[in-house]
Amino acid sequence: MPIIASNFKTNHTRKSTSLFVEKLNEYLKSNEALDEIYIFPTSTSLDSFELNSKLFIGAQNAYHTKNGSFTGEIGLEQLEEFDIKTILI
């Protein structure tokens, strides 16, 4: 099955991410999508929207440990709170 993915890099704020996902959800509700569709928003926007069943969320980055004193990093334990199962490499 093909995968369609969008990596936001640092191009969206929480508000613009929410608006983008809202429009994407509307499109997916009215169109048959057989592909797996993923978005990779900024880490500050991981909880700023709701996904429909055809859309999956991933993280742009993660540090290779569950947690610890790693300034500025995102640990796997933190991503688990958002039910993140996919990370860009």
Regions found by a protein language model. Give the residues of each.
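Short acidic/polar active-site loop segments enriched in Thr and Asp
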Residues: K85
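Short beta-strand and adjacent tight-turn residues that come in two discontinuous sequence segments
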Residues: I89
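Conserved N-terminal beta1-alpha1 strand-loop-helix module at the mouth
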Residues: M1-I74, E81-F82
